[in-house]
A protein has these predicted regions:
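Histidine-anchored nucleotide/phosphate-binding helix
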Residues: 56
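Divalent-metal-activated hydrolytic enzyme cores
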Residues: 1-39, 45-47, 53, 62-63, ...
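N-terminal, polar/Ser/Thr-rich
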Residues: 99-101
Protein backbone atom coordinates (compact mmCIF):
# COMPACT_ATOMS: atom_id res chain seq x y z
CA UNK A 1 0.00 0.00 0.00
CA UNK A 2 1.27 3.43 -0.94
CA UNK A 3 0.79 5.00 2.48
CA UNK A 4 2.75 2.21 4.18
CA UNK A 5 5.57 2.63 1.67
CA UNK A 6 5.62 6.37 2.36
CA UNK A 7 5.66 5.76 6.11
CA UNK A 8 8.59 3.36 5.93
CA UNK A 9 10.54 5.67 3.64
CA UNK A 10 10.03 8.92 5.58
CA UNK A 11 9.89 7.50 9.12
CA UNK A 12 11.99 4.31 9.24
CA UNK A 13 12.02 4.16 13.05
CA UNK A 14 8.29 4.76 13.50
CA UNK A 15 6.23 2.28 15.51
CA UNK A 16 2.56 2.15 16.40
CA UNK A 17 1.46 4.42 19.24
CA UNK A 18 0.78 1.37 21.41
CA UNK A 19 4.27 -0.02 20.77
CA UNK A 20 5.82 3.36 21.45
CA UNK A 21 4.08 3.78 24.80
CA UNK A 22 4.90 0.19 25.76
CA UNK A 23 8.58 0.96 25.16
CA UNK A 24 8.29 4.18 27.15
CA UNK A 25 6.64 2.37 30.06
CA UNK A 26 9.36 -0.28 30.08
CA UNK A 27 12.01 2.44 29.97
CA UNK A 28 10.68 4.55 32.85
CA UNK A 29 9.53 1.75 35.14
CA UNK A 30 13.01 1.18 36.65
CA UNK A 31 13.19 4.95 37.22
CA UNK A 32 10.21 4.81 39.60
CA UNK A 33 7.41 5.85 37.24
CA UNK A 34 4.78 3.47 38.58
CA UNK A 35 1.21 4.31 37.58
CA UNK A 36 0.13 5.21 41.10
CA UNK A 37 3.05 7.61 41.63
CA UNK A 38 3.20 9.23 38.18
CA UNK A 39 1.41 12.06 36.42
CA UNK A 40 1.28 12.45 32.65
CA UNK A 41 1.08 15.69 30.70
CA UNK A 42 0.54 15.66 26.95
CA UNK A 43 1.07 18.31 24.28
CA UNK A 44 -0.63 17.46 21.00
CA UNK A 45 -2.28 19.68 18.42
CA UNK A 46 -5.97 20.46 18.87
CA UNK A 47 -6.83 18.52 15.70
CA UNK A 48 -9.37 15.76 16.35
CA UNK A 49 -7.02 13.22 14.75
CA UNK A 50 -4.57 13.60 17.63
CA UNK A 51 -6.92 12.79 20.48
CA UNK A 52 -6.50 9.01 20.43
CA UNK A 53 -2.99 9.48 21.80
CA UNK A 54 -4.38 10.97 25.02
CA UNK A 55 -6.61 7.92 25.44
CA UNK A 56 -3.63 5.58 25.09
CA UNK A 57 -1.62 7.58 27.63
CA UNK A 58 -4.58 7.50 30.04
CA UNK A 59 -4.67 3.69 29.93
CA UNK A 60 -1.15 3.57 31.32
CA UNK A 61 -0.86 6.65 33.56
CA UNK A 62 -4.47 7.81 34.11
CA UNK A 63 -5.96 10.97 32.62
CA UNK A 64 -3.23 13.34 31.41
CA UNK A 65 -2.97 17.10 31.78
CA UNK A 66 -3.42 18.88 28.45
CA UNK A 67 -0.51 21.16 27.54
CA UNK A 68 -0.89 21.67 23.83
CA UNK A 69 -1.97 24.18 21.27
CA UNK A 70 -1.37 24.62 17.56
CA UNK A 71 1.41 22.41 16.27
CA UNK A 72 1.60 20.68 19.68
CA UNK A 73 3.56 23.61 21.08
CA UNK A 74 2.76 23.96 24.81
CA UNK A 75 0.41 26.93 25.04
CA UNK A 76 -0.58 27.05 28.70
CA UNK A 77 1.96 29.63 29.87
CA UNK A 78 3.81 29.74 33.15
CA UNK A 79 0.59 29.70 35.19
CA UNK A 80 -0.64 26.58 33.42
CA UNK A 81 2.69 24.83 33.91
CA UNK A 82 2.53 25.57 37.63
CA UNK A 83 -0.97 24.09 37.72
CA UNK A 84 0.22 20.94 35.95
CA UNK A 85 3.13 20.48 38.36
CA UNK A 86 0.81 20.90 41.34
CA UNK A 87 -1.18 17.85 40.20
CA UNK A 88 1.73 15.40 40.40
CA UNK A 89 0.88 12.65 42.95
CA UNK A 90 2.51 13.03 46.32
CA UNK A 91 5.12 10.38 46.99
CA UNK A 92 7.04 9.68 50.21
CA UNK A 93 10.20 10.65 48.34
CA UNK A 94 9.66 12.50 45.04
CA UNK A 95 6.93 12.92 42.47
CA UNK A 96 7.18 11.58 38.92
CA UNK A 97 6.16 13.63 35.89
CA UNK A 98 6.08 12.11 32.41
CA UNK A 99 5.62 14.55 29.53
CA UNK A 100 4.82 13.89 25.87
CA UNK A 101 5.11 16.39 23.01
CA UNK A 102 3.84 15.25 19.61
CA UNK A 103 3.39 17.43 16.54
CA UNK A 104 1.50 15.44 13.93
CA UNK A 105 1.42 14.77 10.21
CA UNK A 106 -0.82 12.75 7.92
CA UNK A 107 -0.27 10.41 4.99
CA UNK A 108 -3.14 10.08 2.52
CA UNK A 109 -4.17 6.89 0.65
CA UNK A 110 -1.93 7.84 -2.29
CA UNK A 111 1.12 8.09 -0.04
CA UNK A 112 1.28 11.89 0.00
CA UNK A 113 2.86 13.15 3.21
CA UNK A 114 1.19 16.10 4.91
CA UNK A 115 -2.41 15.28 3.96
CA UNK A 116 -5.24 13.23 5.45
CA UNK A 117 -8.54 11.99 4.14
CA UNK A 118 -10.80 12.78 7.05
CA UNK A 119 -14.01 11.14 8.15
CA UNK A 120 -16.96 11.88 5.84
CA UNK A 121 -14.86 14.08 3.55
CA UNK A 122 -14.22 13.45 -0.13
CA UNK A 123 -11.06 15.53 -0.50
CA UNK A 124 -7.80 15.39 1.43
CA UNK A 125 -6.87 18.28 3.73
CA UNK A 126 -3.51 19.36 5.19
CA UNK A 127 -2.29 17.63 8.33
CA UNK A 128 -1.21 19.46 10.33
CA UNK A 129 -3.29 22.37 9.07
CA UNK A 130 -1.54 24.79 11.42
CA UNK A 131 1.87 23.65 10.20
CA UNK A 132 0.75 23.94 6.57
CA UNK A 133 -0.37 27.52 7.27
CA UNK A 134 2.96 28.20 8.97
CA UNK A 135 4.88 26.87 5.97
CA UNK A 136 2.85 29.11 3.68
CA UNK A 137 3.50 32.15 5.87
CA UNK A 138 7.23 31.43 5.96
CA UNK A 139 7.24 31.43 2.17
CA UNK A 140 4.78 34.23 1.49
CA UNK A 141 4.46 36.27 4.70
CA UNK A 142 1.57 36.55 7.15
CA UNK A 143 -1.77 37.86 5.94
CA UNK A 144 -3.12 40.85 7.90
CA UNK A 145 -5.71 39.91 10.52
CA UNK A 146 -9.29 41.14 10.65
CA UNK A 147 -9.64 43.75 13.43
CA UNK A 148 -10.78 42.15 16.68
CA UNK A 149 -9.04 38.84 15.99
CA UNK A 150 -5.65 37.62 17.11
CA UNK A 151 -3.37 34.76 16.17
CA UNK A 152 -1.01 34.64 19.13
CA UNK A 153 -0.52 30.86 19.03
CA UNK A 154 0.40 30.85 15.35
CA UNK A 155 2.79 33.77 15.85
CA UNK A 156 4.48 32.02 18.78
CA UNK A 157 4.68 28.75 16.86
CA UNK A 158 6.36 30.54 13.98
CA UNK A 159 8.87 32.28 16.25
CA UNK A 160 9.89 29.16 18.15
CA UNK A 161 10.04 26.84 15.13
CA UNK A 162 11.93 29.49 13.17
CA UNK A 163 14.63 29.47 15.87
CA UNK A 164 15.46 25.84 15.03
CA UNK A 165 17.01 26.54 11.64
CA UNK A 166 18.27 29.33 9.39
CA UNK A 167 17.08 27.39 6.36
CA UNK A 168 13.53 27.60 5.06
CA UNK A 169 12.10 24.05 5.14
CA UNK A 170 11.32 22.59 1.72
CA UNK A 171 8.14 20.83 2.74
CA UNK A 172 5.76 19.96 5.56
CA UNK A 173 7.78 16.91 6.57
CA UNK A 174 10.90 18.99 7.22
CA UNK A 175 8.89 21.65 9.04
CA UNK A 176 7.21 19.06 11.27
CA UNK A 177 10.59 17.64 12.26
CA UNK A 178 11.73 21.16 13.18
CA UNK A 179 8.53 21.59 15.18
CA UNK A 180 9.16 18.39 17.14
CA UNK A 181 12.63 19.62 18.10
CA UNK A 182 11.15 23.00 19.03
CA UNK A 183 8.49 21.39 21.22
CA UNK A 184 11.16 19.36 23.02
CA UNK A 185 13.27 22.47 23.65
CA UNK A 186 10.25 24.42 24.89
CA UNK A 187 9.31 21.65 27.34
CA UNK A 188 12.71 21.78 28.98
CA UNK A 189 12.85 25.58 28.99
CA UNK A 190 9.64 25.73 31.01
CA UNK A 191 10.49 22.84 33.33
CA UNK A 192 13.97 24.24 34.00
CA UNK A 193 12.61 27.74 34.64
CA UNK A 194 10.26 26.37 37.30
CA UNK A 195 12.93 24.18 38.89
CA UNK A 196 10.60 21.19 38.65
CA UNK A 197 13.44 18.68 39.19
CA UNK A 198 13.81 19.89 42.78
CA UNK A 199 10.53 18.23 43.70
CA UNK A 200 10.00 15.51 41.10
CA UNK A 201 11.71 13.23 38.61
CA UNK A 202 10.91 14.18 35.03
CA UNK A 203 10.84 12.20 31.79
CA UNK A 204 10.14 14.01 28.52
CA UNK A 205 9.35 12.20 25.27
CA UNK A 206 8.89 14.03 21.98
CA UNK A 207 8.18 12.72 18.53
CA UNK A 208 5.88 12.98 15.55
CA UNK A 209 2.40 11.47 15.57
CA UNK A 210 1.62 10.02 12.13
CA UNK A 211 -1.92 9.39 10.88
CA UNK A 212 -2.52 6.73 8.24
CA UNK A 213 -5.80 6.04 6.41
CA UNK A 214 -7.80 3.35 8.21
CA UNK A 215 -4.80 2.37 10.32
CA UNK A 216 -3.58 2.91 13.86
CA UNK A 217 -1.42 5.97 14.40
CA UNK A 218 2.36 5.70 14.47
CA UNK A 219 4.99 7.59 16.45
CA UNK A 220 8.38 8.64 15.13
CA UNK A 221 10.71 9.23 18.13
CA UNK A 222 12.65 12.51 18.09
CA UNK A 223 13.96 13.13 21.62
CA UNK A 224 13.72 11.48 25.03
CA UNK A 225 15.38 12.42 28.31
CA UNK A 226 15.22 12.02 32.09
CA UNK A 227 16.08 14.48 34.83
CA UNK A 228 16.39 13.50 38.48
CA UNK A 229 17.24 15.34 41.68
CA UNK A 230 20.70 16.30 40.41
CA UNK A 231 19.17 18.48 37.69
CA UNK A 232 21.21 16.78 34.97
CA UNK A 233 19.47 15.77 31.75
CA UNK A 234 20.19 12.19 30.69
CA UNK A 235 19.24 11.04 27.20
CA UNK A 236 16.96 8.02 26.84
CA UNK A 237 16.47 5.79 23.81
CA UNK A 238 12.96 4.58 23.03
Amino acid sequence: MLHIEALNLAFPQAVSSEQYLARVAKLVSPLGFAREHSFAAVSVCRDELTQSFLDLVARRWDQPFSLGGLGALPSLGRTGWRAALSHVPQDPDRGHLIVFGMPHIGIDPEGNIGQSLRRHQNEVTPTCGAMAALLSSLRNGFEPLTPGLDDHEAERLRRIVDSQSDQLPDNLLELTKLAAAAVNDEMWVELDALGAYKEMDIAVFCGIQIHLPDEVDFIYPVASAFMGSDGITKALVV
